[in-house]
């Protein structure tokens, strides 16, 4: 009677070991002196940074959504790891946390060592941009749960904040100014609608030219990471809103008290050309709910600090905070 191996059941331990060897130098390149120990332990260890009066640990988790489908179908896995880090650390800094370390979860039907290595290379690059360390991860090969070519990602960012700086909402006042930090594209939201319009309705192809670039490169442009800008501008920022799913209209109110609303001048927003293409086929109200419309982060700033923020960033004015029921008014 023949014996059945784990590999026969669809799980290749040797491939997993090969993958780990591939990513070791990528992971180590993100380490700072705060990382204790090496790779291969049961848990990652990170020495808490000093200099805080009342340090508070912050954690954020997210994924990349159906942008992964474009990476899988195009065979370009090099940027979605950056997206994964960005979606987590950009949330973290909105609570005035400084990212310390990152962990990832990679699940697939059949481990493609080359593709997985490319993904982790992107995660490592994202960690470098966010100035945090990749100290752990899990690779799950699950035949029957996913098709062989599919994979999914989840990320987990942990950072430190000063306890006294956590409550940003109560600091927002009437007359505060709204500054938009540009996005690099769709970031990691709205791709189900993007795919519906571009590939089902318009029958576009990955290699179609769009503004001098292959369309797929425009769509897979990685999410911008705002950590370094946050660190540079922190003293001049009252609050920050990461513009993700729900767009400006649903994310900006998250940093407003109940008695204040944000008046945003729609004409001041600078959508990228790819958004203009979508606008021809999607209602404008839906556009502002599904996409960031070229705005990756909104900063709430005191009027006297506006010049310093504008000089220290590529941001631009989009509105003000006014008294009234909490909402966003696009005018």
Segments predicted by a language model, with ranges:
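Glycine-/charge-enriched secondary-structure boundary and capping motifs
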Residues: 2-8, 25, 53, 115-133, ...
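N-terminal amphipathic/basic leader segments beginning at the initiator methionine
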Residues: 2-33
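A generic structural signal for residues located within well-ordered alpha-helices
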Residues: 11, 15, 80, 189, ...
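Generic hydrophobic alpha-helical membrane-span motif
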Residues: 18-20, 68, 102, 110, ...
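Glycine-rich phosphate/pyrophosphate-binding loop regions near the starts of catalytic domains
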Residues: 25, 31-184
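Loop/helix-junction capping segments adjacent to catalytic residues or to phosphate/diphosphate-binding pockets
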Residues: 110, 188, 272
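Short, acidic (Asp/Glu-rich) active-site segment that either coordinates a divalent metal cofactor
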Residues: 152, 165-211, 249
């Amino acid at each position: 009677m023949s014996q059945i191996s784990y590999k026969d059941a669809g799980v290749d331990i040797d491939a997993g070991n090969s993958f780990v060897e591939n990513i070791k130098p990528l992971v180590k390149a993100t380490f700072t002196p705060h990382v204790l120990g090496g790779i291969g332990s049961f848990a990652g260890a990170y020495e808490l940074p000093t200099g805080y009066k009342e340090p508070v640990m912050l954690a954020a988790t997210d994924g990349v959504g159906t942008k992964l489908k474009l990476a899988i179908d195009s065979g370009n896995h090099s940027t979605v790891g950056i997206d994964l880090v960005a979606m987590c650390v950009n949330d973290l800094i909105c609570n005035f946390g400084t990212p310390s370390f990152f962990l990832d979860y990679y699940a697939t039907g059949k481990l493609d060592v080359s593709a997985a290595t490319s993904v982790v290379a992107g995660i490592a690059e994202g960690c470098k941009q966010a100035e945090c360390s990749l100290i752990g991860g899990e690779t799950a090969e699950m035949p029957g749960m996913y098709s062989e070519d599919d994979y999914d990602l989840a990320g987990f960012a942990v950072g430190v904040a000063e306890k006294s700086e956590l409550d940003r909402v109560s600091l927002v006042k009437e007359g505060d100014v709204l500054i938009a930090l540009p996005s690099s594209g769709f970031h990691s939201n709205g791709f189900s609608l993007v795919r519906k319009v571009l590939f089902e309705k318009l029958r576009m192809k990955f290699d179609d030219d769009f503004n001098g670039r292959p369309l797929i490169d425009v769509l897979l442009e990685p999410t911008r990471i705002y950590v370094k800008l946050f660190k540079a501008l922190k003293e001049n920022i009252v609050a920050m809103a990461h513009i993700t799913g729900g767009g400006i209209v649903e994310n900006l109110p998250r940093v407003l008290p109940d008695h204040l609303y944000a008046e945003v001048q729609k004409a001041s927003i600078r959508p990228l050309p790819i958004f203009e293409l979508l606008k021809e086929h999607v209602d404008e109200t839906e556009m502002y709910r599904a996409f960031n419309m070229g705005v990756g982060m909104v900063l709430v700033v005191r009027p006297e600090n506006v010049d310093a923020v504008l000089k220290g960033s590529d941001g631009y004015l989009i509105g003000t905070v006014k008294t009234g029921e909490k909402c966003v008014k696009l005018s």
